[in-house]
Amino acid sequence: FTSYAEDNPPERVVFFLNDLMTIQVKIVTHFGGDVDKMIGDALLVRFEGENAEQRAIDAAKAILDAVRRASLARGLGIGIYTGQVISGAVGPKSRRDFTVIGDSVNMSARLCSQANPGEIVADIESINSAASLGFTAEERIQVKGRTESLAVRRWHVDALAKKA
């Protein structure tokens, strides 16, 4: 996203972001997710309750398919990580921001940075809790800030075309 923002006038970037966020938020809401933050072209989303992992994966697949069909100026990758978070107000009293905090937030962002456009990178716990049709075999990746590698599986939007 940084290079896209650098190479385009702010008006075009805002137009792109509005189109992208409209697609993403509509789909996340449809699958019962909660949008915590919009940061650049990224969303921080939380799924809770029954079938949370499956709904997160289904939403991610639907987002990548919708972005591809919309022929937006650029694609995106998605990181999914299952773990604990806490919700709370963070910041000085004059500017509190209600958000989710926890290692899971950091890990999902790290997995997102490992995803190519049109791709989901999900940790094994997320995959083991959901139907993993179309995902690659397990692989281990190094994640910034971690000493141990993390087991993940990948899914690419092109898997939908192969299924059809």
How should these model regions be labeled?
Residues F31-I39, D65-Y81, R140-V143, T147:
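Catalytic core regions of nucleotide second-messenger enzymes
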Residues Q114-A164:
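Cytosolic regulatory/linker segments at or just downstream of nucleotide-handling modules
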Residues Q24, G40, A56, I63, ...:
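Structural scaffold positions in well-ordered secondary structure
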Residues F1-D58:
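Catalytic NTP-binding/metal-coordinating core of nucleotidyl cyclase/transferase enzymes
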Residues I23-H30, A62-A70, R110, Q114, ...:
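Amphipathic alpha-helical regulatory segments at dimerization interfaces
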Residues R46-E53, I78-D97, P117-G118:
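Catalytic strand-loop-helix junctions within cyclic-nucleotide turnover domains
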Residues E53, I57-A60, I101-S108:
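Amphipathic alpha-helical transducer elements in NTP-driven molecular machines
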Residues A70-S71, D103-I124:
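Catalytic/regulatory signature loops of cyclic-dinucleotide turnover enzymes
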